[in-house]
Every structure is written in C-alpha cells, then in structure tokens.
C-alpha cells in the first residue's frame, strides 16, 4: 500500500468518524434533517468542517495516485472540483430550517451537489472492474434521483421531503464507498508503473 493510498483511506476514515460524532451534538434528526443542519451548534459546525477538510485531503491523496491514470488530467481536474465543492460546504453554512435562503446557503448547496456528483464520475473514468463501474453508476443514479427530489428545497427553501436526511446519508455512504473503491483502482494502476 502506498503513502497516498494510506493517506486517502485515513482521510476518509476521519471524515466518517467526524460525521458520526457530529450527530451527538445538537438536535438534528438524522432521518428528516440534512447533515448540514448540524451547523446549528458550534461543535456540529466544527465537525462538519473537519469531515469536509478530511475529504479535501482524500481528494489530494487521490490526485497523487492519479498521476499515471488514463485521462490523468481529467481525473485530477475532477478531484480538484470535488475538493472545491467540499470546501464550499465547509466555508459557506447553509440556512437553518425556517430561515431565509442566503447566497452562502446557495453556494453551500451547489458544493453539496458537487460533493456527491463528482466521485461517481471519477469512479467511471478510472474503473478497471465491473464492480467499480456498477458502484459508480448506481451511486451516480442515486445522487441524481436524490438531487431531483431535493431540487425544490435547494432552489427555493421549500420544505424537504420526509426521510430526506436518511436518503442523504445513504447517498453520502455510497459516495464514500465509491471514493474508497476509486482509491483501490488508482493504486492498482499506479503499481503497474513501479
């Protein structure tokens, strides 16, 4: 296992741990509220920032691993776009339920869309196995379906659908699985160069 691969997996592990711990703070309903609503408490906001920062580190680690990948420039560019979306999530807080939608909240929401839409595209680009292609397509489809169902709330601040929080967390879990599988595919590709 290479250093960038270990670093990427460790960063995903930190993000998952921060995501789990942030549910212990505040009164966010994991089934019916968005993960971003944890910004209602200072510890929740800090842990959301830690999770996003860890995934930015993971993106950087994968970019190192992608240096010998087919379509390396495109893969690395998409990893940069993913990192930018994650940074937007951390820097621009969403509006809390029942409050006016701000410009920062809109930027946050576009960052959230990038955070779940980009990894499946990267997975498809580097896929060497049917397993990663399938996981990427299913995750991309789930993210698109979730995004379409959540679009009215994203654009207008309308009420979110029931179970939207649970659906979001399932899509996030699927996305992180694709990131881990993508790291493995990049590692296998980089080992051919050594």
What are these regions (language model features)?
Residues 1-11:
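N-terminal membrane topogenic signal
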Residues 28-42, 97-103, 156-164:
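Membrane-interface interhelical loops and short amphipathic "cap" helices
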Residues 85-129:
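Membrane-proximal helix-loop-helix units in multi-pass membrane proteins
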Residues 64-75, 128-135, 190:
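Membrane-interface helix-boundary motifs at transmembrane edges
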